[in-house]
């Protein structure tokens, strides 16, 4: 390829020669062209520059003043205020220093070795790489913060001393200077605090971005056993919960935690210098509180670690429920899974409640500790015989106020690091799991791809031995735990192949055809390095590989993007690929041709269409080595032949191809054939295997054709018609291919959408929303009592300050010091009791709300129509159960209580100041108007940004979930870097919302700090010059004003944070209100028949379709058009037709997964719309096209309701030819199955287990949708005879492409282009000029060629 490119390039001398020869002739034309081009280019460049300017972060080009005041974010704030909403496209990009491709380089697995014997290596490395090396400003600002904390009480002392002077010694200028110093210290201290938050946010965002990237990159490298351990749900929890814990810690506590002890020591020295040795009493109280705080912190951390484990379990089961919802609905197993999730939720809530009790204890300690220090210090000071002086009391109170803030913050920092430790362990453990070792050796000029003496196993022994995870430590079912433990030990050395030799000639077709479960897929996975190689060598594997998995991996994007898979579009070659993969005619069934979104996992496509899209991707990649695992199993014979001729033997010719297939009619075309038997490989050419090994392929093919008897007299007449049909088909293809373009109209692009945009609430969070939240957790009376307790508690707190002024003034002259002390301590005790009551009430509301919301959410999701799951990615839905429920469980009620506390503290504080000095009411009213207006402007932008942030989180989870399901395909195509790039883009979109939100918070904080400092200045001026200058109350007003400044900022933040957390509630609440299935048009008006009247329904198994039409969504073309047919009791009906014709839709209609848009379906004369869905689905049986198993055991997958004894299960396992396999497993029926049977059973074995599940239930009416498509011919024949013998009294609809499976049916239904074109006895159809005859004729022609 490179050589050809070099040939086509012209040398520089040739190029310049050509120019000189043509220069004179074309000079004028070139000048004209250049002029035209230059105008177009200028316009295009202007547009590009404008676009870049709009998306570029305004901070990059902001002035110094704009950066200090965050004026650069004003434009976005105003835009949000005017629009009353924001979209993600309105938000500018994050600056380069926050982009994922930059931050992800800070920590890499190469730099960072996560060893289990190294404690907290992740935390340590983050400190080194993110703070010491990248954000040293944090340390400098923290120094300034300590300095201003120490200066504030000293300035206040000077101010108080000034007020104590006699009037003749006071100077107005000096007084104003002191007021100015109070303003300056207040504003500078607050400003330093804000910049500490800002740089902490930058560190936090970088840590979040980096860890998310690191976890995603690791997920793309997981070994197979690690994939079983860490499914998509667990990795989702790592990102949505554990990474968030890291982010929160490094935002607010990362540097503070080191400076706080020094800050506390300096403040204590100041206190002791002010009150003497009495300060040591306060110090002693602080020292005593540390071990108590430590105990509560450790217990909270332990419970949090347990909580995360139970959350993992619940989210994993919920993820399995969401991913398997189509099958769960068909089997009517919703209640089974809901009970399982409910049990796990109960365990989670139990831990949440126990953790809540310790949380209550630590909250009480945090809120009373500082007050207790103050009381102990001042009481000791008084009892020591010291007179309570005004300057001493209020300076000490100011110092103790700073200590109070520290004593509140320090435990939170400690608790946050204690909660960080479990997250640190979990992330480190994940990052230390074994990675896939794709140790393939490329040999130049090799003639074969080979395995020499290869030994392979699925299980990673090291992982099993070192993995002592606690997933089962807390299970109630000890028996299950014991079973799982035994199984792990037994299966550690479960080798798939031992000392095998394999070869595939370069540039040739190698076919692997063996019985079901023999190891065909395992051999393919060995060649691409997906299973562990213990011994031997793999040689000759090229660098560029294409791979089609047995269960196709498709992304929730357009059909085109799934085929291109990151490659550039070559429109002509692309059209050839569509034709070769027989996808051209399918495009007419899609609403927007190849631009149509096909949904998560290709939900919008049939099984055959999925396989062909996967095959088209492999072909389009133009790789040297193509591995295909059963790409022909779900397509009809005509399409299979087309794919083999045009694709596998056509466009793929001269490439190295390995094809796994049960389509044995193609065996004679193979250059090399591989048969796997009992773990050994027999290989050679068709002739070698026939002559040397005695394998009679011809007799197998002949047996397969024995039932397909054709009337020879009609055969010749059809050949002419076939040729005419082929010509028409080619003309039709040409017409469709002409419609395929590089770019499409906007109208068609709109039609292409399958996934709906995520719902988002607009405008402010209404009072009704808050009311709804509290409705779930309390009554109106209970809520009123809670609010009242909060208000009384804060009034009592303020009363303690008033009492201090009374004490210093000795207002009650006749009373002793003991009286003042007793009253002071009594106020403290009452305050303590009220704190306990108010937080107990709040905790109860939060717990009840959490429980009820989750229960309603999972019930609502379980009843939602299947179209909801088709149009919403699983990651988006799962985000409600992980991130949003986590917010409601752990954060919502904290925010609520803090917001209430700050609001009431501000109200009580302002009334206190106005009571002391009524003249302050005027400036307060003016400043309140400013505050209210600024807050309103800010609130809109930050609310909308947080909504955008929540919405932008879902694509991260959805994309992660998709990638976890397609790891082998991504790795085979070597697409890891592209997928990392896509994930980085998703992270950056989420991060830009977060960054803008933080910038907006800084914008308002700085402006509020200025307003707050102005309040301090005004109140201090009034206290000097209003006639109360010698009163303790005037000093109290200044002290109160100083405390209000911090409350104003905190209240503003907490109100917005609460509104942000309410966004999680809104999202959950919206899902709670989803419409239930069966409530669509034409259903509500019909009355349901009671279950009592349907006790033995269906008795006969008659089916009647009357003019049935089906549309999956409003944009789609009908999947079934005017279908009318009747099935009598016990009849066996075969349903055939081209892949994608609408066969599986018939099954979906019967189970009411999709409602008929027209017509009706009757079973035993009863319209199925009048039957309860659970009753309808529970009465029918199905073997789905895609086999689905849930995590559990063999037994629980066959009999989840525990209705049958072991003997019966073994009998049915023998029927489906699985008894031998399962009886050899160490725990037999109790052998563990992971989600969807991955690494435990082959695809064909999973199909047989699903068949067993259906047969043991023995329903009157059974639908078999390609039930044996992935099993070998002999097994299929055996099962066919078993069904014929045992299901004589059952009505069976069999959808199949393999005609030998359905040729003995009573009737054949032929579906073509969504219509029923034939419905007749197979013999009559074969002996007439029918479509079915042509299908049979075509298959026979292929197999006997």
Curated annotation (Swiss-Prot):
SUPFAM superfamilies assigned to the protein according to its UniProt record, in alphabetical order: ABC transporter transmembrane region, P-loop containing nucleoside triphosphate hydrolases
Record membrane topology: Multi-pass membrane protein
GO cellular component, one term: membrane
GO molecular function, one term: ABC-type transporter activity
Residue span of region Disordered: 460-488
Residues reported to bind ATP: 1137-1144
GO BP term, example: slug development involved in sorocarp development
Family under the similarity heading: Belongs to the ABC transporter superfamily. ABCC family. Conjugate transporter (TC 3.A.1.208) subfamily.
PANTHER family: ABC TRANSPORTER C FAMILY MEMBER 9, ATP-BINDING CASSETTE SUB-FAMILY C
Protein name as catalogued: ABC transporter C family member 9
Gene of this entry: abcC9
């Amino acid at each position: 390829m490179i050589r050809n490119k070099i040939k086509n390039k012209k040398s520089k001398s040739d190029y310049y020669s050509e120019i000189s020869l043509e220069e004179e002739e074309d000079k004028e034309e070139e000048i004209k062209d250049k002029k035209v081009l230059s105008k177009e280019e200028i316009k295009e460049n202007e547009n590009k520059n404008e676009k870049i300017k709009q998306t570029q972060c305004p901070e990059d080009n902001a002035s110094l003043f704009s950066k200090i005041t965050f004026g650069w974010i004003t434009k976005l704030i105003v835009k949000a205020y005017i629009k009353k909403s924001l979209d993600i496209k309105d938000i500018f990009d994050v600056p380069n220093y926050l982009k994922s491709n930059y931050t992800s380089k800070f920590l890499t697995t190469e730099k960072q070795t996560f060893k289990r014997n190294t404690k907290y290596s992740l935390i340590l490395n983050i400190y080194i790489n993110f703070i010491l090396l990248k954000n040293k400003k944090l340390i400098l600002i923290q120094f300034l913060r300590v300095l201003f904390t120490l200066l504030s009480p000293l300035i206040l002392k000077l101010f108080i001393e000034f007020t104590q002077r006699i009037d003749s010694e006071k100077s107005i200028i000096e007084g104003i200077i002191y007021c100015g110093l109070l303003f300056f210290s207040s504003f500078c201290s607050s400003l330093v605090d804000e910049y500490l938050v800002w740089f902490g946010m930058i560190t936090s965002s970088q840590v979040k971005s980096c860890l998310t990237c690191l976890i995603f990159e690791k997920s793309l490298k997981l070994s197979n056993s690690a994939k079983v351990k860490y499914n998509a749900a667990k990795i989702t929890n790592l990102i949505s919960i554990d990474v968030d814990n890291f982010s929160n810690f490094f935002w607010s506590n990362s540097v503070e935690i080191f400076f706080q002890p020094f800050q506390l020591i300096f403040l204590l020295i100041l206190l002791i210098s002010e009150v003497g040795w009495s300060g040591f009493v306060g110090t002693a109280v602080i020292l005593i509180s540390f071990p108590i705080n430590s105990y509560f912190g450790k217990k909270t951390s332990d419970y949090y670690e347990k909580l995360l484990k139970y959350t993992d379990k619940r989210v994993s089961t919920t993820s399995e429920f969401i991913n398997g919802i189509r099958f769960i609905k068909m089997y009517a197993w919703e209640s089974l899974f809901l009970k399982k999730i409910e049990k796990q939720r109960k365990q989670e809530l139990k831990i949440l409640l126990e953790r809540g009790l310790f949380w209550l204890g630590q909250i009480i300690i945090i809120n009373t500790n500082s007050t207790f220090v103050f009381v102990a210090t001042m009481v000791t000071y008084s009892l020591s015989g010291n007179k309570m002086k005004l300057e001493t009391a209020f300076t000490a109170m100011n110092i103790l106020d700073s200590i109070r803030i520290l004593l509140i913050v320090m435990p939170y920092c400690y608790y946050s690091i204690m909660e960080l430790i479990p997250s640190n362990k979990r992330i480190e453990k994940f990052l230390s799991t074994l990675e896939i070792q794709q140790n393939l050796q490329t040999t130049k000029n090799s003639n074969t791809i080979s395995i020499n003496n290869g030994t392979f196993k699925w299980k990673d022994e090291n992982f099993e031995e070192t993995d002592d995870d606690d997933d089962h430590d807390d299970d109630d079912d000890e028996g299950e735990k014991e079973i799982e433990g035994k199984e792990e030990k037994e299966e550690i050395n479960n080798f798939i192949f031992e000392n095998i030799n394999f070869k595939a000639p370069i540039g040739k077709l190698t076919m692997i055809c063996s019985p079901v479960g023999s190891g065909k897929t395992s051999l393919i996975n060995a060649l691409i390095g997906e299973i562990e190689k213990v011994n031997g060598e793999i040689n000759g594997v090229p660098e560029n590989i294409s791979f089609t998995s047995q269960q196709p991996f498709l992304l929730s994007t357009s059909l085109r993007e799934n085929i291109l898979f990151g490659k550039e579009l070559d429109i002509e070659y692309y059209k050839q690929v569509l034709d070769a993969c027989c996808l051209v005619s399918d495009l007419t069934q899609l609403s927007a041709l190849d631009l149509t979104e096909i949904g998560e996992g290709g939900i919008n496509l049939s099984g055959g269409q999925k396989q062909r899209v996967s095959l088209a991707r492999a072909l389009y990649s133009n790789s040297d080595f193509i591995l295909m695992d059963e790409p022909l199993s779900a397509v009809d014979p005509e399409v299979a032949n087309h794919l083999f001729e045009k694709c596998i033997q056509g466009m793929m010719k001269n490439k190295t191809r390995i094809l796994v297939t049960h389509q044995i009619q193609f065996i004679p075309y193979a250059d090399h054939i591989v048969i796997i038997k009992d773990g050994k490989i027999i290989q050679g050419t068709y002739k070698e295997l026939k002559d040397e090994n005695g394998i009679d392929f011809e007799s197998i093919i002949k047996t397969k054709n024995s039932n397909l008897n054709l009337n020879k007299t009609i055969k010749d007449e059809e050949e002419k018609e076939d040729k005419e049909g082929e010509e028409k088909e080619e003309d039709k293809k040409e017409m469709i291919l002409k419609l395929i373009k590089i770019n499409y109209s906007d109208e068609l692009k709109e039609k292409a959408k399958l996934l709906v945009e995520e719902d988002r609430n607009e405008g402010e969070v209404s009072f009704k929303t808050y009311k709804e939240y509290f409705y779930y957790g309390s009554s109106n009376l209970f809520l009123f009592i809670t609010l009242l307790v909060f208000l009384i508690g804060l009034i009592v707190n303020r009363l303690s300050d008033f009492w201090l002024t009374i004490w210093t003034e000795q207002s009650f002259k006749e009373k002793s010091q003991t009286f003042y002390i007793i009253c002071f301590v009594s106020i403290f005790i009452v305050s303590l009791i009220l704190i306990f009551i108010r937080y107990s009430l709040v905790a109860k509301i939060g717990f009840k709300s959490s429980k009820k919301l989750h229960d309603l959410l999972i019930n609502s999701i379980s009843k939602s129509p299947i179209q909801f799951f088709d149009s919403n990615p699983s990651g988006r839905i799962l985000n409600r159960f992980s991130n949003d429920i986590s917010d409601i469980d752990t954060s919502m009620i904290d925010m609520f209580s803090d917001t209430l506390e700050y609001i009431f503290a501000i109200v009580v504080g302002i009334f206190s100041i106005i009571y002391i000095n009524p003249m302050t009411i005027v400036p307060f009213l003016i400043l309140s108007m400013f505050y209210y207006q600024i807050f309103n402007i800010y609130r809109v932008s930050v609310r909308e940004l947080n909504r955008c942030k929540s919405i932008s989180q879902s694509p991260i989870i959805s994309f992660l979930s998709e990638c976890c399901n397609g790891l082998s395909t991504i790795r085979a195509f070597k697409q890891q870097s592209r997928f990392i790039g896509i994930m980085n883009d998703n992270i950056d979109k989420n991060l830009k919302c977060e960054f803008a939100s933080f910038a907006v918070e800084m914008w308002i904080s700085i402006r509020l700090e200025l307003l707050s400092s102005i309040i301090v200045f005004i109140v201090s001026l009034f206290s000097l010059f209003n006639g109360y200058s010698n009163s303790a109350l005037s000093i109290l007003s200044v002290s109160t004003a100083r405390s209000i400044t911090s409350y104003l900022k905190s209240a503003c933040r907490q109100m917005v944070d609460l509104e942000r957390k309410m966004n999680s509630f809104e999202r959950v609440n919206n899902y709670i209100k989803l419409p239930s299935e069966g409530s669509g048009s034409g259903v509500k008006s019909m009355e349901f028949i009671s279950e009592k009247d349907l006790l033995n329904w269906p008795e006969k198994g008659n089916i009647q379709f009357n003019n049935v039409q089906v549309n999956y969504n409003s944009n789609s073309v009908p999947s079934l058009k005017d279908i009318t047919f009747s099935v009598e009791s016990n009849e066996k009906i075969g349903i055939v037709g081209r892949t994608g014709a609408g066969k599986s839709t018939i099954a979906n209609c019967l189970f009411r997964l999709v409602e008929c848009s027209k017509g009706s379906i009757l079973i035993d004369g009863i319209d199925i719309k009048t039957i309860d869905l659970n009753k309808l689905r529970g009465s029918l049986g199905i073997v789905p096209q895609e086999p689905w198993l849930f995590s559990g055991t063999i037994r629980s997958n066959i009999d989840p309701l525990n209705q049958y004894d072991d003997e019966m299960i073994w009998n049915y396992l023998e029927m489906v030819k699985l008894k031998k396999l399962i009886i050899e497993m160490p725990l037999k029926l109790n052998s563990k199955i992971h989600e969807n049977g991955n690494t435990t059973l082959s695809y064909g074995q999973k199909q047989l287990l699903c068949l067993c599940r259906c047969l043991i239930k023995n329903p009157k009416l059974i639908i078999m949708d390609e039930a044996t498509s992935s099993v070998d011919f002999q097994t299929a024949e055996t099962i066919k005879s078993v069904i014929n013998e045992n299901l004589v009294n059952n009505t069976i609809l069999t959808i199949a492409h393999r005609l030998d499976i359905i040729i003995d049916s009573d009737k054949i239904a032929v579906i073509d282009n969504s219509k029923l074109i034939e419905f007749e006895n197979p013999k009559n159809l074969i002996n007439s000029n029918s479509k079915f005859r042509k299908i049979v004729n075509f298959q026979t022609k292929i197999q006997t060629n």
